[in-house]
Design a protein with these regions (language model features):
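Sensor-regulatory modules in signal-transduction proteins
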Residues: 212-215
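Short hydrophobic beta-strand micro-motif common in sensory/regulatory domains
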Residues: 206-210
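Short, solvent-exposed recognition segments
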Residues: 129-201
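All-alpha effector-binding/dimerization core of bacterial HTH-type transcriptional repressors
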Residues: 80-128, 153-156
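Juxtadomain coupling helices with adjacent low-complexity linkers
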Residues: 179, 221-260
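N-terminal helix-turn-helix
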Residues: 2-85, 89-90, 250, 254-258
């Protein structure tokens, strides 16, 4: 009786909408109406209505170029809340503190979503002159250490899907905006295991970024250390910042199951 009563509360249309959202969990970033119809075993008209409703609420968005659909900002916001409560931000927190204790520079963790990096957590340093970064802020991928280090292990095709190769805004005179030069730079980042932002996003600010990997070896986030250029000299980067960042990234990745 109890099971029958519980089942009676299930709303089929809501269930269909949630099933549709779950189809975007795999490797495919975008899906079309026909494929969703087959996967969900629903008529195309029903899929259209579900997509229209979810799009109106911001949980799904349409790529106008391909006419396929992908997750929208609202889905991202729900994911951010979950991560903040249970995931990466909390997992990385002690390692951010470790960096700050060693280097006395700001450290933060971020993930790539919707063609930008989103900060999940920030650990401040006790400095009079500091970089202004806050949880929830979005920054570009192509001109930041935390962005570049997360895409450095991606194929050119994957980078195309992210949409950053054709939209590399020049934020400072140091920003790399040439496609070929950027791809060459990413290969070097992947080889050395860390990325540098040499005043590419903000003049007067330098950053180091290292990857965070999960139990599959996939890069799921990045840790970065940022500070004013007059403190983040080449010597300081080499002797203090880069070793501390790499050590923290390795420990955080191990906590996420990498190498287990």
């Amino acid at each position: 009786m109890a099971k029958r009563e519980k089942k009676s509360y299930v709303i089929q249309s809501v269930g269909n909408a949630l099933n549709l959202l779950e189809e975007f969990k795999g490797d495919r970033d975008e899906l079309g109406v026909t494929e969703l119809s087959k996967r969900l075993d629903l008529h195309k008209n029903n899929v259209f209505r579900l997509l229209a409703t979810l799009e109106a609420k911001g949980y799904i968005e349409q790529n106008k170029a391909t006419e396929n659909y992908r997750l929208g900002v609202k889905s991202l916001e729900l994911g951010q809340t979950f991560i903040k409560q249970l995931g990466l931000g909390r997992q990385a927190k002690p390692f951010l503190r470790e960096i700050v204790e060693k280097c006395n520079e700001m450290a933060y963790v971020g993930i790539i979503r919707q063609n930008s990096v989103i900060y999940l957590d920030v650990e401040e340093a006790n400095q009079m002159v500091k970089v202004d970064n806050r949880v929830g802020w979005r920054i570009p991928i192509h001109c930041t250490a935390i962005g570049k280090v997360q895409v450095a292990y991606s194929s050119e095709e994957e980078l195309e899907k992210l949409g950053i190769l054709d939209d590399m805004e020049r934020c400072t005179p140091n920003t790399i905006v040439d496609r070929g030069e950027f791809l060459k730079h990413l290969k070097e980042v992947a080889k050395q295991g860390y990325a540098l932002d040499n005043e590419e996003y903000n003049l007067g600010v330098r950053c180091v970024g290292v990857p965070l990997r999960d139990y599959t070896g996939r890069v799921v986030a990045g840790i970065s250390v940022a500070g004013p250029s007059f403190r983040m000299t080449d010597e300081v980067l080499k002797k203090e910042i880069i070793p501390a960042a790499k050590a923290a990234g390795e420990k955080a990745s191990k906590r996420l199951g990498f190498g287990a």
